[in-house]
């Protein structure tokens, strides 16, 4: 899959690209429990990953993933909201232990079981609030087949470089729909490199330099004692309750992600000179947004387009862009506009408009109508 002058057309779904990119980027094991609409990922992983484990449930899957991560093997799983809700405590554990992993969350219509075969973008707020205390999880969101390849690589490498769980957000349509795609567009992916401790002195598992990222040592090595703990701890990994050193270490977990946020910031901004309106979207709805903007421009309207690919922590860059427009239209497939509220709070300014739906994909015409409205 290299760039050539000759097209290599294939009929492919996003799941296959995600699995292939995961392996090439350095993921070593897939651990999963079958759930719609993530079953293609489960199936392809069984064919492609060096190791694949079928867990009896989602809680077990995340616990096994933590075990593999502690050995220096990057684990990947995929689930939907019912499974993700069961994983939350273990994701918190992995975040506190600073164990890298990738959780692919394929959104479907809720609440609860909802409609497993209907798409949605209803898990935005859940992902944002996954970690108790407001600690951010790097979260990427796929908007097309290019992203299935490129953002998966970024997710794996961000997890390893920052020693953190990472969420790769998608939806039923994006990972189950077969589309015509030119494989020659795919860039080469090199495996991620783990930053291992190479000192001769005693190893302190949570000691860091100015990067705020501790060096890693796997449990399987025999030179140094290694501790992983989900309790509030000091640099040695020893439980310290609420001592200043332990609380400073917990605060570092948030600062670590924020310090390196620019390194995993990805978005598309198609700015049209003279436009006073911008359409913002993500995931599968981004395709409707792209078409809507193209059609509006063909009608002579000046409209810009912002596609968010890094959702969390919320990039300051998005506010910098949106603040330059007198009208902002945010399209997302959920009730009330979850990302819109996370961006602007409960009292959304009057010039910020939403286009929302549940149980169906948003149509370009709906976005066009809101752009043209005077409200």
Predicted regions and their residues:
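Thiamine diphosphate
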Residues: 1-129, 136, 153, 172, ...
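Flexible, low-complexity linker and terminal segments
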Residues: 2-14, 164-375
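Short amphipathic alpha-helical segments and helix-helix/interface helices
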Residues: 19, 91-92, 156, 293, ...
């Amino acid at each position: 899959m290299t760039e050539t002058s000759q097209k290599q057309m294939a009929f492919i779904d996003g799941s296959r690209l995600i699995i292939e990119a995961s392996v090439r980027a350095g993921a070593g094991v897939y651990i999963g429990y079958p759930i719609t609409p993530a079953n293609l990922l489960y199936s392809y992983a069984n064919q492609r990953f060096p190791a694949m484990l079928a867990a009896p449930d989602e809680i077990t899957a995340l616990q096994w993933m933590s075990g593999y991560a502690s050995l220096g093997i990057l684990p990947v799983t995929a689930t939907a909201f019912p499974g993700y809700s069961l994983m939350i405590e273990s994701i918190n554990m992995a975040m506190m232990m600073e164990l890298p992993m990738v959780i692919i969350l394929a959104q479907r219509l809720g609440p609860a079981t909802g409609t497993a075969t209907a798409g949605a973008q209803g898990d935005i707020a859940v992902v944002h609030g996954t970690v108790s205390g407001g600690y951010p999880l790097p979260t990427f969101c796929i908007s097309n087949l290019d992203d299935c390849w490129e953002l998966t690589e970024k997710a794996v490498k961000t997890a390893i470089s920052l020693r953190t769980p990472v969420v790769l957000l998608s939806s039923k349509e994006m990972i189950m729909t077969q589309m015509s795609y030119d494989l020659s567009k795919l860039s080469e992916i090199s495996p991620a490199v783990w930053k291992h401790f190479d000192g001769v002195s005693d190893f302190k598992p949570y000691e860091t330099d100015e990067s705020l990222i501790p060096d890693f040592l796997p449990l399987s090595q025999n030179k140094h004692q290694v501790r992983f703990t989900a309790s509030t701890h000091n640099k040695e990994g020893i439980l310290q309750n609420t001592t200043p050193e332990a609380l400073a270490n917990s605060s570092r977990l948030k600062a670590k992600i924020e310090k390196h946020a620019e390194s995993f910031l990805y978005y598309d901004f198609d700015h049209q000179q003279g436009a006073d309106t911008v359409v913002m979207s993500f995931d599968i709805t981004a395709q409707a947004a792209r078409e809507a903007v193209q059609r509006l421009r063909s009608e002579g309207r000046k409209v810009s387009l912002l596609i968010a690919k890094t959702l969390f922590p919320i990039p300051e860059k998005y506010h910098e862009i949106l603040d330059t427009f007198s009208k902002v239209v945010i399209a997302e497939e959920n009730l009330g506009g979850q990302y819109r509220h996370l961006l602007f709070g409960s009292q959304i300014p009057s010039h910020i408009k939403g286009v929302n739906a549940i149980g169906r994909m948003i149509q370009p015409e709906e976005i066009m109508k809101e752009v043209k409205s005077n409200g």
